[in-house]
Amino acid sequence: MEERNEQVVEEVKEEVKEAQVEEAVTSEDSEETVEEKSEAALLQEKVDELQAKLTETEGRMLRLQADFENYKRRVQMDKQAAEKYRAQSLVSDILPALDNFERAMQVEATDEQMKSLLQGMEMVYRQLLEAMTKEGVEAIEAVGKQFDPHEHQAVMQVEDSEFESNAVVEEFQKGYKLKDRVIRPSMVKVNQ
């Protein structure tokens, strides 16, 4: 019986040892689990932080990309406008010469020499007008048209029953447009 008691004691001791080992392993596991949980929380926090930075950076990149596209579009439009209106400065400088040609051609020729001179001036005038037309310059229609402050500059007002109200009665100086841009408005007399 003593043997049996010793055997039971031995078994109990072994069970206690196993329980202690199991308890030690469990406490180590729970310490590791706590450490793993806190490490997981730190990692999740880091992931969230990096995700926020990524979102912010993506947003900034998209805004920069949109700004760059807008910039390219503006540069292209400016380039097209510069090409379209490249002759504006030259045309503005030539307009006074055209006005002088028109005035000179209104003079009555008294002899053959004068007629020949006027004929030569008229040829030069037509060539200038042709060259300007090729560049997209056109005279602004004024007399009989409704007054348009974008195309006409009113220098006088009159009352004339032959014309509608606010119609251009007389043109003092021709106006010109380059494509769709007014270079010089027509100086006109307007009916009230």
UniProtKB/Swiss-Prot annotation:
Region called Disordered, residue ranges: 1-34
What are its GO cellular component terms? cytoplasm
List the biased-composition ranges (Basic and acidic residues).
1-20
Primary localization: cytoplasm
Q: What are the GO MF terms of this UniProt record?
A: adenyl-nucleotide exchange factor activity; protein homodimerization activity; protein-folding chaperone binding; unfolded protein binding
Q: Which family does it belong to?
A: Belongs to the GrpE family.
The entry's protein name is: Protein GrpE
Please name the gene that encodes this protein. Answer: grpE
